UniProtKB/Swiss-Prot annotation:
GO-annotated molecular function: methyltransferase activity; transferase activity, transferring alkyl or aryl (other than methyl) groups
Family: Belongs to the class I-like SAM-binding methyltransferase superfamily. CmoB family.
Catalytic activity: carboxy-S-adenosyl-L-methionine + 5-hydroxyuridine(34) in tRNA = 5-carboxymethoxyuridine(34) in tRNA + S-adenosyl-L-homocysteine + H(+)
Name of the featured protein: tRNA U34 carboxymethyltransferase
EC number: 2.5.1.-
GO BP field: tRNA wobble uridine modification
Keyword Nucleus assigned: no
Lineage: Bacteria, Pseudomonadati, Pseudomonadota, Gammaproteobacteria, Pasteurellales
Signal peptide: none
Pfam families, per the entry: Methyltransf_9
InterPro entries: CmoB, Mo5U34_MeTrfas-like, SAM-dependent_MTases_sf
Coiled-coil region(s): none
Function: Catalyzes carboxymethyl transfer from carboxy-S-adenosyl-L-methionine (Cx-SAM) to 5-hydroxyuridine (ho5U) to form 5-carboxymethoxyuridine (cmo5U) at position 34 in tRNAs.
Amino acid sequence: MIDFRPFYQQIAVSELSSWLETLPSQLARWQKQTHGEYAKWAKIVDFLPHLKTARIDLKTAVKSEPVSPLSQGEQQRIIYHLKQLMPWRKGPYHLHGIHVDCEWRSDFKWDRVLPHLAPLQDRLILDVGCGSGYHMWRMVGEGAKMVVGIDPTELFLCQFEAVRKLLNNDRRANLIPLGIEEMQPLGVFDTVFSMGVLYHRKSPLDHLSQLKNQLRKGGELVLETLVTDGDEHHVLVPAERYAKMKNVYFIPSVPCLINWLEKSGFSNVRCVDVEVTSLEEQRKTEWLENESLIDFLDPNDHSKTIEGYPAPKRAVILANK
């Protein structure tokens, strides 16, 4: 099973020490309520070997290189274990000569977002809805002091720990299996990321308030979410599904989203990027058996979802507390 005690030791001597008032008991409850597959996934992490690493690159990729090349048999055993943790959604990872080609080219998003950010060097960072942690490792590559990701999905936790093990057990990033609504307001993070979360929230303004409560005064929010065209009054509320997703509630226009952030008390709100999701960025691979973007779009008109809504378009908004 995954041991959170090293994380407790890390935060005991950091600005996050007050989190120890609630976090250990929360995770103890979580461990009693885990999904039936969790024990199997955690064992797969245990089965992965400890490998000597010659070089780790988190600046331009998430990549580890072995001291000596792995044999074909060693590679195949690792691939077998990693494929037991499918589907791999956010990546890619290059681990000891193994290319984990995930559904999403999350490096595309990172390349769009990074140039606009306040430098991450020596920052304490929270990544909300972090998935398997790809962007967390890229934040570490930019010199972050510590990156904490939160995501309640047990598979993502096990994928993260598998990658960590193949990155020489790097402790600068940690994934905690909670939702932001379960976090006590800490108010200490220099940068808070929420990417691909807001449209899944029934109450988007509550989510913005929760993000603000984790930031220090002057800290930076990085918000990436689905948007639609329109003025400051326009919000798309899908009837049943959007791109085959049942849990999409509100897709605002960029001016509307800026208004929400200002209404929530953020300052210096600005949109730095808007991009239609491409079939190169989200696609099927051998590491994903499920459907992907091509299956969610109108086969005769890729500017629309299969339900007839505008195809996914994402904006990056920055703001300060």
